[in-house]
UniProtKB/Swiss-Prot annotation:
It comes from Rhizobium meliloti (strain 1021). Pfam families: Adenine_deam_C, Amidohydro_1. Keywords: Hydrolase, Manganese, Plasmid. The lineage of its organism: Bacteria, Pseudomonadati, Pseudomonadota, Alphaproteobacteria, Hyphomicrobiales. This is Adenine deaminase 4. The keyword Membrane does not apply. Its cofactor is Mn(2+). The gene is ade4. HAMAP family: Adenine_deamin.
Amino acid sequence: MSDVREFIRAASGGESKATVAVCGGRLVNVVSEEIYQADVAIYRDRIIAVGDISEYIGPQTEIIDAADRYLTPGMIDGHLHVECSKLSLTSFAKAVLPLGTTSIVSGLDQIIVVGGPDAAREFLDEVRQTPLKVFWGAPCKTPYTMPRSTVGHYFSPKDHRDTHHWPECVGIWETVREFIQEEDEDVLQAIEIGQANRLPVLGCCPMTRGARLNGYMQSGVRADHESYTPEEMLEKLRAGMHVVVRESSISHFLSDNLRIVTEMGVKALRRISFCTDDVVASDILSRGHLDNMVRMAMAMGISPMAAIQMATINGAEALRIDHKVGSISPGRTADILIVNDLRDFRIEAVVANGTVAARDGRMVVKLVPPQRSAGLLRSVKTTPVTAADIAVPFTGTTPFAEVLAIAVTPEKVFVRTRRDVRLPVVDGKILADASQNVQYVTVVERYGKTLNRPVAFVSGFNLKSGAIASSTAPDDNNIICIGADPQDMAIAINHLVANNGGQVVVDKGEVVEFLHLPIGGIVSDIDPAEMAAFELRLDEAARRLGCDLPWPFMYMFVLQITAIPDYAMTDLGVVDCVNLRIISPLAPDGPAKANTLAAE
């Protein structure tokens, strides 16, 4: 309570004066929806007064001149798998703080499937040493896959009981609709534990309408970020949800989702907020982060006030953290953006946790990553593969086999459909066929629990030769590899195993590009600009193999997600995401045994 007393005394005009004062700016008050002249007094990391702050200024108060500029709250990303950026939290802070993002809401689920709650605790302790804030949602369970795939840690009801008291915990996160539909016992227990701790349920229900939505709403879900059409978003809004607009690096929904405002006449703008879900460094550095979403919304005709609310207070209210962040108000964390022009919305300076963190798009404070635990640096535990392992056997007598290929297209981001193809058979093995745009895909379980490494086929990557592979691949972070040549695929996979994770391109027996991701096999401490350069080189190397997708590695690494229809690929094999079963690529109309082995 000593801190509370200290803030009360400072805010009440006592002897303690403001440590920082932001003076001369025009305040964008997202609560009262006004813009007016006001100064802001900050004591340590908290706002203590707004308006006339003359009595709070002392001889040691640092004055920040904001004359002729606007003051807006720091922005909040309402749903983000931050590890999918491949940046550690320290490096991610370097990427987004200069762009005005001062808070993110994340389940840290990708590091949890690798190292469990201890790994998440390491990440949360790490971010405390930066000006960025992480509000943590305890994943409803991990993995999210159905049927359940193999991961390093299964986040269970016991984990919920053990972590809900963490100060960063704000809810039950990524509550996948299928878990509610199937009455998954672990998830229902997690919700009950959360209810006992007064924590909200945060959703994940793409393409959910009608009776399915009604059933899903019985879980008490408060917010959802997965609307594929404005009609779907409107139905969820009418059902009582806070709706979160997603604009990620790979899926661009903002322009379509916000038609509920610009074309469908929705007035409840305070129930609409922003998230980016999955972003990569090259996209952040080229387009921006939440600042880009604000500009996009205004370009559609949304008012500056409403667009800024969507990036700040609306998300805070949806997550029930508006007493901490989301507005420039007494008692809130001192996260303030200084903006020259609201419509241009370029961030001139960022005050985060009461100190200037960035100016003119650059960090002005030095962020140093922590020493990493040995467990996170040695998380890839599988044995090497051979080219002979990457095969789909065929016992028939015909020279061709009818198979199901998991098809991806840039027109339907995330959605994987079925493509029936006829492939050649040689020596009892079904071969991929580049002339038909069909490649091999395999997922190698990398935690040393099994010898699972099923092989199937994908279509849409258009690889003419070589292979691409990644050990960061939500929701399991098992090694996924796509290729035209089994030998190159084996080299790619084994390179990741030998280096404890990363992303790699191999062609004609040679590693042509490699990004090392040593922390849990999924993230790195390198700076955002260096990461962006690696991403561009990796994607360009994939394009030289023939891939013409806009983000080759992102299209590959989401193939393990079973919460999005119609098909996925996990360490159990091909998943029919609609009927929640494993199927054989040779028998797409019926279930088949998974090609799995127990580890010896």
